Amino acid sequence: MAARKQSSQPSRTPVSYEDVAVSFTQEEWEYLTSTQKTLYQKVMSETFKNLTFVGSKKKPQEPSSDLQDKNEEQEKSSSCTGVFKGGPFFFCLTCGKCFKKNTFLFNHQFPVRSRRLAVTNPQSRKGKGYKAQHRGERPFFCNFCGKTYRDASGLSRHRRAHLGYRPRSCPECGKCFRDQSEVNRHLKVHQNKPAASNQAGNQASNQRLKSRVPPTTPRSQAPALKYVKVIQGPVARAKARNSGASTLNVRSNSITVVRSREKISCPYCHITFTMRTCLLTHLKIHFRRQPNQHFCCKESAHSSNTLRMQKIYTCPVCDSSFRGKESLLDHLCCQRPIRFSKCWEILGHLLGYLHEPVVLGNIFKVRDSSGKRMESRRRRRKRACTENPETEGLSGKGRVAPWEMEGATSPESPVTEEDSD
């Protein structure tokens, strides 16, 4: 009877996740769309959860050594994208790799470089500057224009531009946008608009600003409202440029800056400019008095810097030009108070400061009408010291010795040699 009961009951064999799971190769996984990949991941995760819930009541049996070797060979041969072994249910949306825990998936998508590991073990992989695995990879591309994106959300947001689909709208003005982030960015424009009470108070100051702005053509004013940019930043305190208005308190976290293509026209001619500085430079042409005019040659320069760069100081001897007086004096004096240059000596002879004549830059000594040679100041002083030592107290380079005085005799007294020329 026991044998009949055993034969009547069907044989129960354990079912593993590998028997139920459906795997794809790398080529098959690339042909799947994003929606098919998402559906596949959801189905496989539910299947794995059901199997783990049923198998949790019984203690899992240890697999044999042959089964372990077979699983290891299959894991090595299978690629990381699309092939699921062992029942993971957390998937990477970029490459399709699967993980058992959510933390493993997070570490796979956002690997962090460990500073402690870099210090303790500089030869490790992370210590050498471990990069993210998906950095620079853009697997999702648009079929219309070919642009690539890192995730499916960016691709879906881009497709709305081709289809003209703008589901989000502004609650105040009704303008439509592609996503909520653009709506939130657009709402800051409405928040920075002044109230009705402030508009009446600022009307006078706005008229002052308009009066100072040069006249523009109405054609150039038309596209000014199309270029609006919002600059986010801390609370700022701004002041109107070139106006007598008081400072403007900006109490919001963003400042609206209107980009305009207005061209400022010259009031004296029909030339237009995009920058006020260019207009001010151009207005110097219409002035009666020429700006940056040199006091000597009466020539006007484009700017004061150009006037400063001119070499207006020239040497009267060698015709060398310099920018300042200091450079000219350094040239004449050779930057030394004792050693004078040839130009300074020639100029001194021409002006009468030096007694020795100079011809063509060569200094030479000549004799006067009586036939005597002209002595220099140093030579005359030395001769006067040797002739009258009592008054001067000096003889040559040193002090006068007692035996050198008048009336003294000494065998070792020095003999002064007079110049015999």
UniProtKB/Swiss-Prot annotation:
Every KRAB domain range: 15-88
Molecular-function GO term, any one: zinc ion binding
Domain notes: The KRAB domain is required for function as transcriptional repressor.
Single Gene Ontology BP annotation: negative regulation of transcription by RNA polymerase II
Organ and tissue specificity: Expressed in oocytes and in a subset of adult tissues. Expressed at high levels in testis, and at low levels in cerebellum. Present in sciatic nerve and spinal cord (at protein level).
Family: Belongs to the krueppel C2H2-type zinc-finger protein family.
ZnF (C2H2-type) ranges: 90-113, 140-162, 168-190, 264-286, 313-332
The UniProt record lists the keyword Repeat: yes
Name under which the protein is recorded: Zinc finger protein 57
Reported induction: Up-regulated by LIF. Down-regulated during differentiation of embryonic stem cells, or during retinoic acid-induced differentiation of F9 cells (at protein level). Regulated by JMJD1A, which mediates histone H3K9Me2 demethylation at its promoter, thereby activating expression.
Gene3D superfamilies on file: 6.10.140.140, Classic Zinc Finger
Example of a GO cellular component annotation carried by this entry: nucleus
Annotated site location: Crucial for 5-methylcytosine recognition: R178
Cellular compartments annotated: Nucleus
Disruption phenotype: Affects the maintenance of DNA methylation imprints. The absence of just the zygotic function causes partial neonatal lethality, whereas eliminating both the maternal and zygotic functions results in a highly penetrant embryonic lethality. In oocytes, its absence results in failure to establish maternal methylation imprints at the Snrpn imprinted region. Intriguingly, methylation imprints are reacquired specifically at the maternally derived Snrpn imprinted region when the zygotic Zfp57 is present in embryos.
